[in-house]
A protein has these predicted regions:
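Cleavable N-terminal export/targeting peptides
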Residues: 1-26
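Outer membrane beta-barrel
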Residues: 24-165, 173-175, 181-191, 243-247, ...
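Detector for outer-membrane/organellar transmembrane beta-barrel domains
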Residues: 27, 182-273, 281-282, 333
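Sequence/structural signature of outer-membrane beta-barrel proteins
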Residues: 41-47, 69, 77-81, 110, ...
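A generic beta-sheet turn/junction motif
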Residues: 147-151, 215-219, 250, 291-295, ...
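Outer-membrane beta-barrel "beta-signal"
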Residues: 181, 246, 321-335
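C-terminal closing repeat unit and adjoining cap/tail of repeat-based domains
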Residues: 286-311
Length: 335
């Protein structure tokens, strides 16, 4: 079954590439833009004396326009820890400048793409917030409006979804909803405020809300975010997570293999138990070696994580290496 899925993916992308190459200058539509991410890594846990190699992500995507105001997006994951997944399958209509309506499987407007997208993450491993709060995609309807207010770029998003996992369109008596408002853009200051109601089943109902702030300069960036997840079924399983991270890119000579070097540092924590101690926190140091002129793109990365535990969390203790100090060497290609 996986082989068939893989072959189908290559056939679809091959057909799109052939169609694109066959266009003439007078044919503007349909248009195609391809993107991809490949992440291979090695991990070593000194305390346990164990190590592993893995292909963490292998993504291929295509997006473009069918007509002047009609967009599409498709993306597949060839290997997410060995699993094939369809990630994005959506169409968008843009009847007015800045306004879009999207239907299909797409991202939920609650997480920041720079903490969930393998191609834009600052470290090999995601923040606690991005990894353990819930899925990042669902099937549904999303509307977004980009506008300027007082010369500040802003956007407002609202979506309703199946309140389920991706690639599983089930009948529901309750749908989930998410809303987000953003101030600024990815260069300079940017801040967002968001809420997400997720009534998955009688046993699982989460309500999330949070805010973030980031600043990106020419060759550096700093990001911070806090989010609460209320458990509407079990009050003793509420979660609160936070992170603060930053990186700086130093240019090297163009004739070097590595075009820049990027030190990075992150502190994050996640807390569930209602006491005066943080359950699990982590300090991560990273050093990236850029393969291209563009900072924070394709690179060879070396990270080391230190974990500090006051209470065991079940979802962070599924195997010994999960919450143990860890060395990671990762090769990331972004195209």
């Amino acid at each position: 079954m996986k082989i068939k899925q893989l072959l189908l993916s290559f056939m679809l992308f091959g057909y799109a590439a052939f169609s694109f190459s066959s266009e003439t200058d007078s044919t503007a539509y349909p248009s195609f833009k391809f993107d991809g991410t490949l992440k291979n890594k090695f991990e070593y846990v000194p305390e346990a004396g164990t190590s592993r190699f893995s292909v963490r992500n292998s993504r291929l995507g295509v997006s473009g326009k069918i007509f002047p105001m009609v967009d599409y997006r498709a993306q597949v994951e060839l290997s997410s820890e060995g699993k094939f997944q369809v990630l994005d399958l959506s169409g968008s209509i843009k009847p007015y400048e800045g306004l879009s309506f999207t239907l299909g499987q797409t991202s939920i407007p609650i997480y920041n793409s720079y903490t969930t997208n393998p191609g834009t993450m600052m470290f090999a491993n995601r923040t606690f917030l991005a990894k353990y709060y819930g899925g990042t995609r669902d099937i549904g309807f999303l509307t977004k409006y980009d506008f300027d207010a007082l010369q500040i770029p802003m956007s407002a998003e609202f979506g309703i979804f199946n309140s389920n996992v991706i690639n599983s369109p089930t009948w529901r008596d309750k749908l989930s909803y998410a809303a987000r408002i953003s101030f600024g853009d990815m260069k300079g200051f940017r801040s967002t405020f968001k809420v997400y109601d997720y009534p998955n089943s009688p046993e699982i109902h989460h309500f999330m809300y949070g805010a973030d702030l980031r600043y990106e300069g020419k060759n550096w960036k700093v990001e911070t975010e806090a989010m609460k997840r209320d458990d509407k079924v079990n009050n003793d399983k509420d979660l609160f997570a936070y992170y603060l991270q930053g990186a700086y890119s130093f240019k090297l000579k163009e004739n070097y293999l590595f075009k820049n070097i990027m030190p990075a540092v992150r502190y994050d924590f996640i807390d569930q138990i209602a006491d005066n101690k943080i359950d699990v926190s982590r300090l991560t140091f990273g050093l990236g070696f850029g393969l291209g002129k563009k900072a924070f793109s394709s690179l060879l990365r070396i990270d080391y994580e230190w974990y500090f535990k006051n209470n065991q969390l079940d979802f962070l203790n599924q195997y010994e290496e999960m919450d143990a100090d860890k060395l990671t060497v990762e090769l990331v290609y972004i195209f």
